[in-house]
UniProtKB/Swiss-Prot annotation:
Keyword Acyltransferase: no
Domain of life: Bacteria
Organism field: Gloeobacter violaceus (strain ATCC 29082 / PCC 7421)
NCBIfam families according to UniProt: ATP_synt_epsi (TIGR01216)
Protein name: ATP synthase epsilon chain
Known partners and oligomeric status: F-type ATPases have 2 components, CF(1) - the catalytic core - and CF(0) - the membrane proton channel. CF(1) has five subunits: alpha(3), beta(3), gamma(1), delta(1), epsilon(1). CF(0) has three main subunits: a, b and c.
Amino acid sequence: MALQIKIVAPNKVVFDDQVDEVVLPSVSGQLGILTNHAPLITGLSNGVMRVRKQGTFIPIAVLTGVAEVDNNEVSVVAMAAELGSGIDVDRARAALARAEQTLATSQNKTELLQAQTALERANARLRAAGAL
């Protein structure tokens, strides 16, 4: 028996398939989901979700959201999500550099919060792409 997983972001369905395992970047740490997992709802932090299909893990960058597990179905709604294989590594590295520069030089609290979020997003994207 497999898990049915569907990952949606505001502009698209990112992933919709049957898989053997899901590892979520929950707000309380990494959370592994296998078949017949107890029902749950959890918040997701910026990070890399991994889904295992036929022995291979597929990395997916996830930027905050929520996941629900029930009856061997995993539903993820994220602010943004992107398959690791589709990430523009150069663009993510440039975003990381900009965020690091802002964090090092800015005194504005709003800019610092935005830069911290941008840093987390760039790190998640680079990890999902296998570049970190």
